[in-house]
Amino acid sequence: CDIGSNRIKKILFDNKPSCIFNLAAETHVDRSIDNPKAFIQSNIVSVYSLLENFKEYSKKNKKTCLIHVSTDEVYGDILKGRSHEEYPYKPSSPYAASKAASDHLVYSYVRTYKVPAIITNCSNNYGPKQHPEKLIPKIIYNILNNKKLPIYGNGKNSREWLYVKDHCEALLKIFKKGKIGEFYNIGSNFNLDNIKICKSLIKTSKKKINLGRNVKIQFIK
């Protein structure tokens, strides 16, 4: 689905949704460094187009709302504790910057045009059928295919992991009880180092299959 398409307006008026959950985005940090243009187009320009179409739709349908799903990457590096909704935005990659810009754009439409929208910022998702460029599915794929397991730095980078089903349940709660114009952080309060995740997946895999000789951690500077 291209949220920047002009067909979105017709889809809205034909189907009359009570809520739109905007989860469409370019999301991979490394790819954003190599090709920031795609992230600017998808995460900013297309969100602008969606907002314009939703603005017209919401004028005719007063009970609808838009839930714009974003990321905790917009806060930058959290050196101590957890991020909260009052944290300043300090994006540290083109991906994070594009999501931060889209968050501000959505909020500006709430303030300026009274568009009924809510912004959420979630921690790192994981779950079935996740894109293989993400850490957990990438490690699993490499284990199954007798490849080295790439870990950046010393592997001590810690992430807060959120199961995708839990994320969906949180979004539904926000749809039912959230306030227009508010920001909501969604997380699990469960942090784990990348190296620990990798070792845990190796340990679990050993119980199921015979590991190939190439299955070993490779630290990447």
Residue positions per predicted region:
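N-terminal Rossmann-like NAD(P)+-binding domain of SDR-like oxidoreductases, especially those catalyzing
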Residues: 1-125, 165, 194
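Residue-level signature of the cytosolic catalytic core of signaling kinases
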Residues: 4, 128-132, 190
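Proline-centered turn/helix-capping motifs that create local helix->coil transitions or kinks
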Residues: 59, 67, 78-80, 114, ...
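Short beta-strand segments
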Residues: 67-70, 119-127, 153, 185-188, ...
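Gly/Ser/Thr-rich beta-alpha loop segments that engage phosphate groups in nucleotides
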Residues: 78, 98, 129, 155-157, ...
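C-terminal substrate-binding subdomain of Rossmann-fold SDR/epimerase-dehydratase oxidoreductases
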Residues: 137, 143-221
